[in-house]
Amino acid sequence: MKQICILGSTGSIGTQALDVIEQHSDRYEVYCLTANNRYEMLAEQARKFRPAAVVIANKAHYEALKLLLADLPDIKVYAGAKALDEIVEAQPIDMVLTAMVGFAGLSPTIHAIKARKTICLANKETLVVAGDLICRLAAEYHVNILPVDSEHSAIFQSIVGEGDNEIEKILLTASGGPFRKFTLDEMRDVKAADALRHPTWDMGAKITIDSASMMNKGFEVIEAKWLFGVEADKIQVLVHPQSIVHSAVQFRDGGVKAQLGVPDMRLPIQYAFSFPERLPLNGDRLDLFRQPLEFFEPDMEKFRCLAMAYEAIRRGGNVPCIMNAANEVVNEAFRHDRCGFLQMADIIEATMQRATFIAQPTYDDYIASDAEARRIAASML
């Protein structure tokens, strides 16, 4: 019985992970659930899955959560960022699913790696911000990082059994988001409500906006570089509106392996949990007769965030960290009508130019760079 800790259990990935665990309750048990603000939902989940502990990151909700679980004394209730770092180190835990959003996922992921827990990585910002550090720590502590993003899971599934066969190119697919066919003038006027209507995936608000701007795909290019040791110029983004081909790998003989399936995040979540085994999963099955599969080149002028991600990789150091911090600020501002859709890229680009460059950042440098970039980006709103 694998004991699983879910960082971010009330979000889109977290709730779908609990569905997987419920389907395979003979194999998986929830050791800990965590949330940032949604304490009522966290309490409901705790009642259903009976974990050993729950953590609410926002300390303001601690008393309310404790009250909701007062009749279940076996469930320990903790609060705060430090509690997140400590809970992932708990001895019974086998796997940690990092489904938190943003920079906040970095510290508990590092603590989980140092405690030699298998990492099911859904928090892509961890590798965007500190890919070099995370990969070095994973190697040092002999920890497996299993990708949960559908694209990276597809790449991972495509290279299983390939041993040392060299990857010639990664074909990273993108839906193109809701504004794929918009002109720049049309994109100038879009609002958060428009961007939150993703054509193929059901995701949280932050990642849905990132998908609309294609910053999410930029993050995934960086994530793929670190996960698979492939340089950015060998990672090609393909706009694939149907989201059926989740990604593909081209090898040096010209052969291409791809992973296909209906857009259902439970599949990559379950694959990370069960690897190398495949377990049954209820849900729709792929019908290739239903629709044609299309592929287009992304428009880097319209979707500047994707171009900036390649630039951040090229510059290296703390630049991806700076880009991520600025993006978190403008993404939230856009969702609250304090920033225009195209203005997000302007502010991110300006922050990348103005923030202090550090060629070989330490963990403390990442913390400082994140704070500095947030201040710079916020000053332009």
Language-model features: where?
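Catalytic, metal-anchored helix/loop core of enzyme active sites in primary metabolism
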Residues: M1-L381
